Swiss-Prot record:
One of its GO terms (biological process) is protein refolding. Its EC number is 5.6.1.7. ATP binds at residues 30-33, 51, 87-91, 415, 479-481, 495. The gene is groEL. This is Chaperonin GroEL. It comes from Acinetobacter baumannii (strain AYE). Signal peptide: none annotated. Forms a cylinder of 14 subunits composed of two heptameric rings stacked back-to-back. Interacts with the co-chaperonin GroES. One of its GO terms (molecular function) is ATP-dependent protein folding chaperone. PANTHER family: 60 KDA HEAT SHOCK PROTEIN, MITOCHONDRIAL. It holds the Pfam family Cpn60_TCP1. The lineage of its organism: Bacteria, Pseudomonadati, Pseudomonadota, Gammaproteobacteria, Moraxellales.
Length: 544
């Protein structure tokens, strides 16, 4: 076991705060509409330019191990806020730095750190309740557009794209961000249910120009097993052939004699058919087959519930308005399933999302909800260079998360105004003793920090603006982009309540832990002896 370096009291805290300040100073220059860029060197490729606080925070690692501990703790603030709300990482870092720097003055003056932390916690609870009470619902797409624009550093085109995407696929729909191939941003929307499985054989394609199989008003057969024997399918095929409608078969696999017979019948025009592998694996495949069944009004033919393929009838098949199958994807548009059954299935999956502890599982369940409830929208980012593309993608990701948070918990006045207004909720609030009251006052001063930083980044005088905003009422605040005062909601400067709340809660939590730290321990690096010179190889004499 290697030897440890141990620091106590003020010497430990001063090192930790030095690390916090290095990271926070690097992150906070990105805050606000006139936030600056941070250029990050890469060991390979071009440098990365970003205005995203969490990206900057993740890049910072300090040589001094005690300082690095402080930096990593405050980095946790931005990461946690990013995980919960998807945005507000810079605000959280600025708040953590302000609470810590205010708090350390009181600790140095001899106050009890535990009581200070209790006071900070009391104040945070009061401010969070205040934010929740003043939040306005973000129902209309105008509000969504404004939130998206603000979060993307006042880029209105990004806000419009996100609002359009949400309008198309609904607030529950899946919206993904990808790097595009052109200069302009674009929005692609896939309506209906799409899954990443294409036709089993290219001979099923009936549109040779696009190499897709398009089926109008088809029957849909869902089978939870491999099909290799054509005899199992004959009764269903004959029944469908009599109707003259096409047939889509979704099964674990279709192979051998069964596949060959389907291909031949399709090519001869006896029956228009296409076979596709079921999406997912194991239990997830069973669940997704059930989703498709509910969406299309079909019954999954499964031996687990005592159903055999030979006994399947037209009543067991689902239908849809149109199905398009390409080499890699299948899209089912306008399934004929019962609307009430679909809504019930969506509720069921949402309940599973609430219970799930795995981020991956939650993401997959959310995708299933979107496929049942709406569709999938893809925002394709356009840019002139790869560096610009990556920077823009960071901003669009932030904006997308912010709009989701706004839909969830509503919006408050942006630009740090909601926090400054929350000071009024702390008027007359006292703790159980003087030290706790001092903790409440620490937060009272610290929550001005985001507005101060936004103003400083815009090149204006923070104290003048803070006083002007404090003298105003309601949503009155300062628009750093234009240098004007006015109603923040009317000017379209909104922040999601969830982002503001999460930033404050996580900042206060980590800052409180740092204030109550009395000892820090780290490894002493071992001085490894230099490797000895390599001796010459024997037996090599006489070579020219």
């Amino acid at each position: 076991m290697s030897a440890k370096d141990v620091k106590f009291g003020d010497s430990a805290r001063s090192k930790m705060i030095a690390g916090v300040n290095v990271l926070a100073d690097a992150v906070k220059v990105t805050l606000g509409p006139k936030g600056r860029n941070v250029v990050i060197d890469r060991s390979f490729g071009a440098p990365h330019i970003t205005k995203d606080g969490v990206t900057v925070a993740k890049e910072i690692s300090l040589k001094d191990k005690f300082e690095n501990m402080g930096a990593q703790l405050v980095r946790e603030v931005s990461s946690k806020t990013n995980d919960i709300a998807g945005d507000g990482t810079t605000t959280a870092t600025v708040l953590a730095q302000a609470i810590l720097n205010e708090g350390i003055k009181s600790v140095t003056a001899g106050m009890n750190p535990m009581d200070l932390k209790r006071g900070i916690d009391i104040a945070v609870k009061t401010v969070v309740e205040n934010i929740r009470s003043i939040a306005k619902p973000a129902d209309d797409f105008k509000a969504i557009e404004q939130v998206g624009s603000i979060s993307a550093n006042s880029d209105t085109t990004v806000g419009k794209l996100i609002a359009q995407a949400m309008e198309k696929v609904g607030k529950e729909g899946v919206i993904t961000v990808e790097e595009g191939s052109g200069f302009e941003d674009a929005l692609d929307v896939v309506e209906g249910m799409q899954f990443d499985r294409g036709y089993i054989s290219p001979y099923f394609a009936n549109k040779q120009d696009t190499l897709t199989a398009e089926l109008e008003n088809p029957f849909i057969l869902l089978v939870d097993k491999k099909i290799s024997n054509i005899r199992e399918l004959i009764s269903v095929l004959e029944a469908v052939a009599k109707t003259g409608k096409p047939l889509l078969i979704i099964a674990e696999d279709v192979e051998g004699e069964a596949l060959a017979t389907l291909v031949v019948n399709n090519m001869r025009g006896i029956i228009k058919v296409c076979a596709v592998k079921a999406p997912g694996f194991g239990d997830r495949r069973k669940a997704m087959l059930q989703d498709i069944a509910i969406l299309t009004g079909a019954t999954v033919i499964s031996e687990e519930v005592g159903m055999s393929l030979e006994q399947a009838t037209l009543q067991d098949l689902g239908t849809a308005h149109k199905i398009t199958v390409s080499k890699e994807n299948t899209v089912i548009v306008d399934g004929a399933g019962d609307a009430a059954a679909i809504a019930e299935r969506v509720q069921q999956i949402r309940a599973q999302i609430e219970e799930s502890t795995s981020e991956y599982d939650r993401e997959k369940l959310q995708e299933r909800v979107a496929k049942l409830a709406g569709g999938v929208a893809v925002i394709k980012i356009g840019a002139a260079t790869e560096v610009e593309m990556k920077e823009k993608k960071d901003r669009v990701d932030d904006a997308l998360h912010a709009t989701r948070a706004a839909v969830e918990e509503g919006v408050v006045a942006g630009g740090g105004v909601a926090l400054v207004r929350a000071v009024n909720a702390l008027e007359g609030l006292k703790g159980a003793n003087e030290d706790q009251t001092a903790g409440i006052n620490i937060l009272r001063r610290a929550i001005e920090a985001p507005l101060r930083q936004i103003v400083a980044n815009a090149g204006d005088e923070p104290s003048v603006v803070i006083n002007a905003v404090k003298n105003g009422e309601g949503n009155f605040g300062y628009n750093a982009a234009t240098g004007e005062y006015g109603d923040m909601l009317e000017m379209g400067i909104l922040d999601p309540a969830k982002v503001t709340r999460s930033a404050l809660e996580h900042a206060a939590s980590v800052a409180g832990l740092m204030l109550t730290t009395e000892c820090m321990i780290t490894d002493i690096p071992e001085d490894k002896p230099a490797a000895p010179d390599m001796g010459g190889m024997g037996g090599m004499g006489g070579m020219m």
